[in-house]
A protein has these predicted regions:
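Flexible "arm" and connector segments at domain edges
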Residues: 1-60, 64-108
Length: 108
């Protein structure tokens, strides 16, 4: 399995070979994440139980791809920002207050 760093390198090679860096501004990448997330959501439109898994995989890959590119353009360590966010979520959602609940942290 490829490491995250190897995936980043493969994605960057793909972009470089096509001279697309000029289009991959933080703003454009953020927009692309939203667009692809909407396409992912569309896979589940009107039916929560029947969906085309191959299409879900395609759209999910697009979302991850753009997220990885945005983090790279902004020089962010994906692993670290996820760990940092998990730590914040651990504080905001203590198990003893939120176990089995979907309540937002400020309403616990």
């Amino acid at each position: 399995m490829d490491s995250l760093e190897e995936l980043k390198q493969k994605i960057q090679k793909f972009v470089d070979e096509r001279d697309w860096n000029q289009y991959h501004t933080p703003s454009n990448l953020a927009k692309s994440i939203s667009i692809e997330a909407s396409e992912l959501l569309e896979c589940f439109q009107w039916n929560d139980t029947e969906y085309d898994l191959s299409q879900v995989k395609e759209e999910l890959a697009d979302v991850f791809n753009y997220c990885i590119q945005l983090a790279s353009v902004l020089n962010l360590d994906i692993r670290q920002i996820i760990l940092d966010k998990m730590e914040k979520n651990t504080q905001k959602y203590p198990v003893d207050k939120c176990l089995g609940k979907s309540t937002k942290y400020d309403k616990l």
